[in-house]
């Protein structure tokens, strides 16, 4: 089950709902 908690500011949520680094430094 995915727990709906905020990701860190520099992370994004992937298609599985995981917090993934880093939305400011990649594609």
From Swiss-Prot:
GO molecular function: potassium channel regulator activity; toxin activity
Key words of the record: Ion channel impairing toxin, Nematocyst, Potassium channel impairing toxin, Secreted, Toxin, Voltage-gated potassium channel impairing toxin
Predominant place of localization: secreted
An example Gene Ontology CC term for this record: extracellular region
Localisation: Secreted; Nematocyst
Family per similarity comment: Belongs to the sea anemone BBH family.
Function description: Possible voltage-gated potassium channel (Kv) blocker.
Name the record gives this protein: Toxin Bcg III 21.00
Classification lineage: Eukaryota, Metazoa, Cnidaria, Anthozoa, Hexacorallia
């Amino acid at each position: 089950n995915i727990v709906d908690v905020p990701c860190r500011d520099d992370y994004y949520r992937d298609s599985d709902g995981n917090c993934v680094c880093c939305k400011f430094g990649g594609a």
